[in-house]
Amino acid sequence: MKKKEPELLFPKQPKRRKRMKHKKSILQEKNGICFLCDLLEGDTRQQYGLHKHHVFFGAANRKLSEEDGLYVYLCVRHHETGPDAVHVNKGTRTMLQIYAQETYEKTHTREEFIKRYGRSYIQ
């Protein structure tokens, strides 16, 4: 004979992962054009395989960038491999961070930005 398991009066609810808030980018339309190709070279051709780049990356800031819509779509050359790539060239990365902060400050204050991201990128 099988032993019957006692039923719990208050069964545990399964744990649910918190869903990340996905907001549209406030920096760029999702139109298939690399943000930096357009900005630096005036190239507005549509490209396939664009990467989503969170302007303020890193564990905590990536989530905040996603929630605030602070991300752009970049081609591989401007994201990772080229000389002007944001993960290679500090000047390009800083330019993008300043642009994102200025856009964020159109609807918020600088103090709110600093409180949220830990520092100001505008000198």
Can you name each region flagged by the protein language model?
Residues 19-22, 59-60, 89:
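Residue-level detector of alpha-helix boundaries and kinks
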Residues 71-96:
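Short Cys/His-centered divalent metal-binding micro-motifs
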